[in-house]
């Protein structure tokens, strides 16, 4: 993502001003949409049968992530109809995500809020379960610092 843009261009980009060229905004918006699609597993194929296993990884992987007061984590498996229980990647906690330039990160957060709050229900986003979407918003609101107010409001 963001491969042809310079760090300076992205850092200085402000969607509400002329500092960011319209071409750069268009390119970034495409990349931001791709990141959001990835993060909500929009292209995930449904499981046709229950996945079972007894590996150590299957038991320890969910324990690596933060949990909210209800004991929920983005790393919790479903393994019946989909891989994870909640439609949001645990990569939201990654250093890579946190290192995104602020204008880009703000836009990714905004897209995720639109998708997970149910505001965006077109195409591939229509298949997402509203209860699981709300839970994902709540889990992140309880376990990640420095979230935008729109995220916190959508999680309530």
Where do the protein language model's features map onto the residues?
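A cross-kingdom marker for long, charged
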Residues: 23-156
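Single conserved hydrophobic/aromatic residue that forms the stacking wall/gate
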Residues: 1-19
């Amino acid at each position: 993502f963001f491969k042809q843009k310079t760090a300076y261009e992205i850092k200085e980009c402000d969607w509400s001003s002329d500092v960011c060229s319209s071409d750069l905004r268009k390119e970034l918006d495409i990349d931001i949409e791709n990141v959001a699609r990835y993060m909500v597993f929009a292209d995930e194929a449904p499981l046709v049968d229950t996945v079972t296993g007894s590996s150590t990884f299957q038991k320890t992987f969910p324990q690596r992530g933060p949990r909210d007061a209800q004991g929920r984590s983005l790393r919790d498996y479903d393994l019946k109809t989909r891989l994870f229980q909640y439609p949001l990647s645990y990569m939201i906690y990654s250093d890579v995500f946190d290192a995104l330039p602020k204008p880009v990160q703000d836009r990714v957060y905004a897209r995720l809020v639109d998708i997970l709050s149910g505001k965006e229900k077109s195409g591939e986003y229509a298949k997402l379960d509203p209860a699981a979407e709300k839970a994902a918003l709540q889990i992140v609101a309880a376990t990640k610092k420095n979230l935008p107010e729109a995220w916190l409001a959508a999680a309530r």
